[in-house]
Amino acid sequence: MGEIMKFYDREKELNYLKTYCQLEPNSILFVYGPKSSGKSTVMRRVIKELENSNIVFFYYNLRKYATPTRDEFLRVFFEKSDKKYLLNKLELNLGVCKFGIEENFDFNNLCLNDVFAKINESINAVVEEGKKPVLIIDELQKLKNIYFNGGKSLLNELFNLFVSLTKMEHLCHVICLTSDTLFIDEIYRNSTLKNASEYYLIDWLRKGTIRNILKEEGFSEEEINYALDYLSLPYEISQLINNKKLGLSVEQTIKQWINVEKDGLKYLIDTTDLDEEGLYNVLSKFKDKIKISYDKEVKKEEMKYLKFLIENEILFYDVINGIIKPTSIIEWHAIKEIINAMQ
């Protein structure tokens, strides 16, 4: 799949993030959005497009780790070297850096203050060279359950460090990517971060964009009009294109996708201890509309069902705009089919 295709018309997002990286650091930026909406892809593109600028990117991708341990965190973030920062070997094609740490440094007896001192040293080394450091952490919520000696939560302490690096000292941008919206909810309500964070939504692809891509890929007007009622995520487009090459009709592909999501959702409901009726009641809010307002349409007793559906990535909760919707339009159709089958 060509580079150009993936980025078809993410201009608005690209421009926002590129500009953001070039402004003076003043807050932590949380980039959030439904699963697979293309957050990492856009971010990597930003890094690529700014590779000849005076920005040094520290980019850490935690999606590869189920639940990283303390040691994994240290090995991911630091590299033994006589330099204060060096190229990240895990991301060679991106040309991003990681923090350097002395050869004789003992990872086992590291306290959080040492960790933060090292991060500070690396960032200051970049600034002293007249360059701008930008720290990007993809799937930051994976660090949630890491504790250092004295039971200190790594994530909470990191937030304090990030506030200091951005809002207080204006040294370094910190950009955190996540599709875990309950995590964004926690952050949104976290007092440390109250006036120190901003949020940016990377949502479904716009319909006009999808139409242009499919047109360019040689789909007929009829196929495009059919597909537009169902597509919302970048990877769906590339799969649809591949399936067409393999001889599957647009309709067949989309029906298959809906069935897969429907079976997955049914299995989820059948295997949970939560009350089935409660779950179906919440799902039936989406029978005739694709999004609901958290304020106006959610009762307290429905919260546990909603939380369960959000945790399992059936629903997406846009905390900042106060709306809840399925994670994709395909998921919405799966929900509607399940609701209709119940009646």
Swiss-Prot record:
PANTHER family: AAA+ ATPASE DOMAIN-CONTAINING PROTEIN (PTHR37096:SF1), YALI0E33429P (PTHR37096). SUPFAM superfamilies: P-loop containing nucleoside triphosphate hydrolases. Keywords: ATP-binding, Nucleotide-binding, Plasmid. GO terms for molecular function: ATP binding; ATP hydrolysis activity. It comes from Methanocaldococcus jannaschii (strain ATCC 43067 / DSM 2661 / JAL-1 / JCM 10045 / NBRC 100440) (Methanococcus jannaschii). The lineage of its organism: Archaea, Methanobacteriati, Methanobacteriota, Methanomada group, Methanococci. ATP binds at G33, P34, K35, S36, S37, G38, K39, S40. Coiled coil: none annotated. Belongs to the archaeal ATPase family. This is Uncharacterized ATP-binding protein MJECL26.
